[in-house]
């Protein structure tokens, strides 16, 4: 019995109690999905639910009486061995061995779909992440967002949402001018501007621009700078896109900031806010009443010289997303943008939307790279920062992605290069991938020994403690995925996989899938092969959500 099947049985029990007049509830008050969770203490059963506590007030009954009505009906369900009422009205459900073991076949038959919602939510989410300026390679912070953002997109899709991955291409503003001046100086063998960009990549980009335009340095200096601005940004952005693709991250939309200003989108956004009464004029400038919506002060949107302020682009971009039909706009920002959150939320509210619903902002903390216990602060190519390429070159894509996504974005993380290249159980990505490789090896050995799944499946035989614990872990996967999407926390999937891998390794040590020399193949072996293959499937599904490969050999 799967958690979804138990949830449905609980709902049926509640519905039957309402129909019999034993439970005074509007049928609409019976939850469409009754939440079941693993008890912290396994002595309290396989699954627990607090649904009786949730419905008691509406039903006008003590929670334990509501629980008793459910208990009586649930005990009639095939596969339910015991239902106990605990504390104020919790229901603890114990399944019989066959019902619990049936999950192994359910997982294998579902295949890649196991853990994914079968019902689309209808929700359209715009997930914007990385959005690094095209003035240099992606640094470690952007690399973390690439790993977390892409994994979150995969998790949200698995939970039933439609997700658009979007990269905001910052090709408008002062940083682009500084980049152009840096390229110009490098091409002319001049010192870099005081506020410019350094690193070997600037030399590479400048040389590439000159190769495409051999007579460029013969032009007037202003024309040179404009060419370096245009061509340098394109070359840098092409390099960024290539790095992301090699990292396994593909965006659906690359949105150019400059288009907001050239298309009139900024003016339209300001006018919409004016029509809503959110705009006023003062000191020769145009202001947005953000202080009415929680910001510490009002913000200038059009400066006194007539030029748009920085926030004007944010206004136009947010409105553009909403007009494209997105219900939720999820934005990932680095810790240095923390102070920017109140004005963004105020902007959302000024348009008549709901902050935290139509606009969500996730703030990520710092990433530190360690080698031999010492922080790595310099890149071979970028000069002052460590880049995505540096990390991938050191440990590979799988280890880089996994290590960046396995911790909550709320916390700073230290990436130990020595640990991530170690083939040992204290290396988390190796530990999980090795579990998958072990399941693959078990399947190969089973085939060689004549153990075939299709010959038998008797879940009542899965009674060993390590088998029960492994089945319990497998059953949790759909809820882990759903919760990770709901909370925007893909690290939950990684931590779950580590727990699952641990339980599989214990099962592997305790339970033989193939008979010893001279022994006959039994239904125990065949049924354990189902459990092995179910574990293999869930490990692959979970690693896939993180953008990490599931190797058959290590």
From Swiss-Prot:
<keyword id="KW-0963">Cytoplasm</keyword>
<comment type="subunit">
    <text>Monomer.</text>
</comment>
<dbReference type="InterPro" id="IPR009080">
    <property type="entry name" value="tRNAsynth_Ia_anticodon-bd"/>
</dbReference>
<protein>
    <recommendedName>
        <fullName>Arginine--tRNA ligase</fullName>
        <ecNumber>6.1.1.19</ecNumber>
    </recommendedName>
</protein>
<dbReference type="InterPro" id="IPR008909">
    <property type="entry name" value="DALR_anticod-bd"/>
</dbReference>
<dbReference type="InterPro" id="IPR005148">
    <property type="entry name" value="Arg-tRNA-synth_N"/>
</dbReference>
<dbReference type="Pfam" id="PF00750">
    <property type="entry name" value="tRNA-synt_1d"/>
</dbReference>
<dbReference type="GO" id="GO:0005737">
    <property type="term" value="C:cytoplasm"/>
</dbReference>
<dbReference type="GO" id="GO:0004814">
    <property type="term" value="F:arginine-tRNA ligase activity"/>
</dbReference>
<feature type="short sequence motif" description="'HIGH' region">
    <location>
        <begin position="132"/>
        <end position="142"/>
    </location>
</feature>
<dbReference type="InterPro" id="IPR036695">
    <property type="entry name" value="Arg-tRNA-synth_N_sf"/>
</dbReference>
<keyword id="KW-0648">Protein biosynthesis</keyword>
<keyword id="KW-0547">Nucleotide-binding</keyword>
<dbReference type="InterPro" id="IPR001278">
    <property type="entry name" value="Arg-tRNA-ligase"/>
</dbReference>
<comment type="similarity">
    <text>Belongs to the class-I aminoacyl-tRNA synthetase family.</text>
</comment>
<dbReference type="InterPro" id="IPR035684">
    <property type="entry name" value="ArgRS_core"/>
</dbReference>
<dbReference type="GO" id="GO:0006420">
    <property type="term" value="P:arginyl-tRNA aminoacylation"/>
</dbReference>
<dbReference type="InterPro" id="IPR001412">
    <property type="entry name" value="aa-tRNA-synth_I_CS"/>
</dbReference>
<dbReference type="InterPro" id="IPR014729">
    <property type="entry name" value="Rossmann-like_a/b/a_fold"/>
</dbReference>
<keyword id="KW-0436">Ligase</keyword>
<dbReference type="Pfam" id="PF03485">
    <property type="entry name" value="Arg_tRNA_synt_N"/>
</dbReference>
<keyword id="KW-0030">Aminoacyl-tRNA synthetase</keyword>
<dbReference type="GO" id="GO:0005524">
    <property type="term" value="F:ATP binding"/>
</dbReference>
<keyword id="KW-0067">ATP-binding</keyword>
<dbReference type="Pfam" id="PF05746">
    <property type="entry name" value="DALR_1"/>
</dbReference>
């Amino acid at each position: 019995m799967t958690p979804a099947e138990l949830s449905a049985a609980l709902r049926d029990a509640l519905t039957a109690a309402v129909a019999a007049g034993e439970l005074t509830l509007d049928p609409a008050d019976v939850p469409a999905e009754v939440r079941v969770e693993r008890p912290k203490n396994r002595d309290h059963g396989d699954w627990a639910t607090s649904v009786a506590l949730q419905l008691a007030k509406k039903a006008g009954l003590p929670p334990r009486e509501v629980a008793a009505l459910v208990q009586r009906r649930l005990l009639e369900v095939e596969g339910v061995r015991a239902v106990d009422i605990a504390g104020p009205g919790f229901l603890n459900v114990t399944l019989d061995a066959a019902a619990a073991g049936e999950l192994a076949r359910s997982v294998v038959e579902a295949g890649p779909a196991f853990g994914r919602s079968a019902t689309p939510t209808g929700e359209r989410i715009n997930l914007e992440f990385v959005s690094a300026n095209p003035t240099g390679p992606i640094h470690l912070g952007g690399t973390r967002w690439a790993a977390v953002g892409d994994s979150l997109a995969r998790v949200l899709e698995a939970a039933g949402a439609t997700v658009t991955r979007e990269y905001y291409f910052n090709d408008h503003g002062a940083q682009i001018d500084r980049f152009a001046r840096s390229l110009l100086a490098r091409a002319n063998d001049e010192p870099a501007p005081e506020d410019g960009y350094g690193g070997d990549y600037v030399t590479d980009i400048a040389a590439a621009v000159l190769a495409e335009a051999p007579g460029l340095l013969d032009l007037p200096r202003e024309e040179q700078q404009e060419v370096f601005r245009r061509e340098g940004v394109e070359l840098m952005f092409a390099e960024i896109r290539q790095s992301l693709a090699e990292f396994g991250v593909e965006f659906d939309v690359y949105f150019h900031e400059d288009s907001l200003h050239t298309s009139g989108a900024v003016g339209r956004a300001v006018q919409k806010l004016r029509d809503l009464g959110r705009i006023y004029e003062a000191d020769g400038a145009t202001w947005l009443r953000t202080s009415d919506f929680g910001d510490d002060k009002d913000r200038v949107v059009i400066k006194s010289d007539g030029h748009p302020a920085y926030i004007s682009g944010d206004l136009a971009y947010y409105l553009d997303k909403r007009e494209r039909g997105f219900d939720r706009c999820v934005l990932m920002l680095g810790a240095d943008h923390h102070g920017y959150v109140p004005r963004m939320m105020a902007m959302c509210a000024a348009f008549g939307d709901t902050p935290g619903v139509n606009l969500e902002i996730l703030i990520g903390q710092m990433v530190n790279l360690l080698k031999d216990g010492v922080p790595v602060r310099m890149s071979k190519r970028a000069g002052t920062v460590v880049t995505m390429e540096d990390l991938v070159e050191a440990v590979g894509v799988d280890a880089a992605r996994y290590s960046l996504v396995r911790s909550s974005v709320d916390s700073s993380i230290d990436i130990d290069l020595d640990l991530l290249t170690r083939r040992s159980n204290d290396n988390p990505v190796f530990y999980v991938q090795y579990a998958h490789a072990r399941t693959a090896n078990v399947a190969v050995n089973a085939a060689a020994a004549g153990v075939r799944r299709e010959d038998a499946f008797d879940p009542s035989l899965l009674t060993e403690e390590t088998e029960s614990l492994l089945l319990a872990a497998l059953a949790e996967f759909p809820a882990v995925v759903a919760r990770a999407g709901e909370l925007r926390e893909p690290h939950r999937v990684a931590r779950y996989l580590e727990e699952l891998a641990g339980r599989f390794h214990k099962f592997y040590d305790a339970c033989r899938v193939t008979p010893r020399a001279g022994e006959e193949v039994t239904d125990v072996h065949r049924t354990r092969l189902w459990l092995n293959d179910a574990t293999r499937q869930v490990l692959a599904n979970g690693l896939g959500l993180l953008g990490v490969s599931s190797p058959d050999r290590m």
